[in-house]
């Protein structure tokens, strides 16, 4: 293989803050390099330097691509050289077709007129290359996230990409979609296309990479061959300390039944012939961590939403708290019964991005800080905010900072802080560590254990089986809306859980 990319002694500052400090990395033609590091470590900043988002002259150091010095003024310059980046937040225009997105700003023309036939055939060929069997005229809004990722890659191939950068590409994908994407990336190697792969999912990193590069606090910690480094080694390099177990599971007392769900059925919001939850029954005990496992679409989230009163469709069944039947038709009624839920999509349902960290934390519990019912006791609110930030270890320069500027892990910790101010007895966590770096995951796992030790009952819904098995006392297995198994987590394996989910 020949040298494709060299980044030499890259230093990037924002005022007096050094974001990147003398980082050097290299990449061969057709090689897959995974870039690992906690949120805020400098991974994205380094890629923005490479892609011309931070132009030449805005940083110190040199970049060479195919042996030539790269002096990009913007991202278009690097795209013309064959460097393409696909961000975690996809940039496709949802109300346009796949074809229109593919050639947006890059139309095939003849005598100044767009050649629709050539673009259609070219689009069809590119979609076949990424194993996507759809009509080019399909609206992007009609595609799933996995299909949209493949369209983004096809779009990059249309630009004659030689280096493809993927930032957290599988964060919102199903296991099947992830397998398709990883196989495609490996297949691109045969066409001498190199890849920089950014992910917190270390099993994927190990499976796909030729080399693994770790960045911490803007420093290059090291680059090693993937086959010569373990996941534990990567974690230690990322966080700067040894984590003996990613899933700290401290002993805690499990008490009497606190929640019982009987015959819970929920129908699709717009098609009542489809059951999202089908006659679900289970119990939850005081101080217990109950994991809920199952494939995407198994009804896990819908079941939790019914318990929390946030499900938008029709549902029926019985919910008992401390052996007393309760009616929960809206979130306020759940909160009044000391049930709180952290939603799956934190950006859409968990935070108000333009509001401050502090105001997001106290948003659901303002009545606790009021004189009478209308006037906020600001000194008391400020004290509670600072205590919550310290307790949850939310990393922020100020409580006044807009929460949208925090990393995913710190946003999630702020949401947890908000929920804990409601003093729940039952805490429901839906995908609590999705898109979060390994250090923040560890802190959230520790918090879950601490809360269980204090007597809180916790339901954890996760698509990551190692996570479910690592932190749960008991595992509820769901498939196609049904509770297929209720398993004590005594050395449970992933195979046992999947077998329980799929058995008839």
Curated annotation (Swiss-Prot):
Residues 5-242, 259-500 form the ABC transporter domain. It is an enzyme of class 7 (translocase). Pfam families: ABC_tran. Its EC number is 7.5.2.10. Belongs to the ABC transporter superfamily. Xylose importer (TC 3.A.1.2.4) family. Part of the ABC transporter complex XylFGH involved in xylose import. Responsible for energy coupling to the transport system. NCBIfam families: PRK13549.1, xylG. This is Xylose import ATP-binding protein XylG. It comes from Histophilus somni (strain 129Pt) (Haemophilus somnus). The gene is xylG.
């Amino acid at each position: 293989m020949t040298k494709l990319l060299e980044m030499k002694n890259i230093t990037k500052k924002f005022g007096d803050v050094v974001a990147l400090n003398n980082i050097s990395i290299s990449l061969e033609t057709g090689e897959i390099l995974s870039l690992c590091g906690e949120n805020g470590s400098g991974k994205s900043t380094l890629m923005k330097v490479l892609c011309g988002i931070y132009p030449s002259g805005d940083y110190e150091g040199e970049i060479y691509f195919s042996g030539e010095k790269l002096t990009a003024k913007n991202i278009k310059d690097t795209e013309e050289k064959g460097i393409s980046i696909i961000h975690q937040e996809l940039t496709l225009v949802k109300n346009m077709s796949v074809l229109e997105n593919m050639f947006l700003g890059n139309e095939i023309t003849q005598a100044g007129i767009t050649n629709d036939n050539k673009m259609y055939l070219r689009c069809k060929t590119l979609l076949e290359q990424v194993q996507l069997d759809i009509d080019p005229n399909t609206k992007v809004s009609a595609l799933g996230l996995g299909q949209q990722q493949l369209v983004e890659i096809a779009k990059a191939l249309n630009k004659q990409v030689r280096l493809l950068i993927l930032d957290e590409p599988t964060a919102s994908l199903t296991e099947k979609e992830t397998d398709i994407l990883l196989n495609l990336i490996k297949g691109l190697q045969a066409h001498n296309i190199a890849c920089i792969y950014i992910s917190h999912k270390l099993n994927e990193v190990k499976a796909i990479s030729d080399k693994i590069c770790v960045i911490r606090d803007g420093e290059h910690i090291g680059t090693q061959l993937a086959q010569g480094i373990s996941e534990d080694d990567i974690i230690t390099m990322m966080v700067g300390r040894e984590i003996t177990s990613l899933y700290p599971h401290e002993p805690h007392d499990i008490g009497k039944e606190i929640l019982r769900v009987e015959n819970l059925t929920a129908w699709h919001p717009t098609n009542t012939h489809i059951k999202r939850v089908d006659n679900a029954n289970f119990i939850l005990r005081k101080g217990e961590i109950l994991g809920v496992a199952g494939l995407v679409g198994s009804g896990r989230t819908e079941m939790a939403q019914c318990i929390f009163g946030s499900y938008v469709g029709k549902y029926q069944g019985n919910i008992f708290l401390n052996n007393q039947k309760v009616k929960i038709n809206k979130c306020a009624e759940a909160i009044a019964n000391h049930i709180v839920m952290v939603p799956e999509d934190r950006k859409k349902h968990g935070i108000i991005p333009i509001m401050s960290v502090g105001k997001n934390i106290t948003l659901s519990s303002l009545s606790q800080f009021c004189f009478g019912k209308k006037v906020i006791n600001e000194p008391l609110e400020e004290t509670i905010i600072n205590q919550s930030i310290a307790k949850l270890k939310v990393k922020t320069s100020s409580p006044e900072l807009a929460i949208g500027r925090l990393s995913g892990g710190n946003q999630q910790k702020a949401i947890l802080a908000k929920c804990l101010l409601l003093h729940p007895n039952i805490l429901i966590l839906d995908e609590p560590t999705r898109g979060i770096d390994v250090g923040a995951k560890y802190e959230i796992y520790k918090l879950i254990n601490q809360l269980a030790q204090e007597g809180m009952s916790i339901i954890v819904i996760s698509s990551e089986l190692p996570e479910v098995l690592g932190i749960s006392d008991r595992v509820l297995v769901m498939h196609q809306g049904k509770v297929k198994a209720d398993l004590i987590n005594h050395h449970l394996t992933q195979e046992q859980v999947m077998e329980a989910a799929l058995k008839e």
